[in-house]
Amino acid sequence: MKHCIKLENGIEILHSNKPKDRQYLWNTMMEFRVGSWMLENTDPKAKFILDCTWTQDQGDFTFNNASFEFKENRGALSSGYISLEVLNTTKCEPSGLLKSVNDQVNYFLMYFPVYRNYNGHNSDLMDTMLLFKTNELYHWVRNRDEITASNNNTQNSNALCYKVPARYITDCESFKELIIKQWHIPEYELKAIDIPTQLYGLFKDE
């Protein structure tokens, strides 16, 4: 059964009776921050509902009744590859992009914070967020002969992922055509968005 917390700013948080595991807290915090950023910077009158339930059958959040799945892909721009998970090999079930397709989630939103080291390596790259239509992204990946799915780690792998070259963001016309919106949002700007205390209470104590 889903319950709803209504915040003073109009944002709503859906949750289950059973608290979620603490390991999901960071991802949920980022989902809240990204949705809040979109609310402030794209449509202040929109209806933003964050889904913290166990089922999440309509993505991570809805924005004006459109559903969104959010994935943070840290280091993708500096490593050269965008990882798109499609199968949880531990549970033998669809996950990531494929689960979003099966759940008919409208949009797939990816955020790429850049790893930067002390001597300025990758200082020319910007933290980037890209918006895609879920179905279009999935079928594009499936139909590219040069892109194959592989285990995310050589040891203790728990997911099967497609690896899309990060250079496709600028160098591949068909991939560029999939991008509905592109924003350059510094990570510190997202981290500056406060997390409501009610959100922490939806997760188990450590």
Placement of each model-derived feature along the sequence:
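Nucleic-acid endonuclease domains
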Residues: 1-206
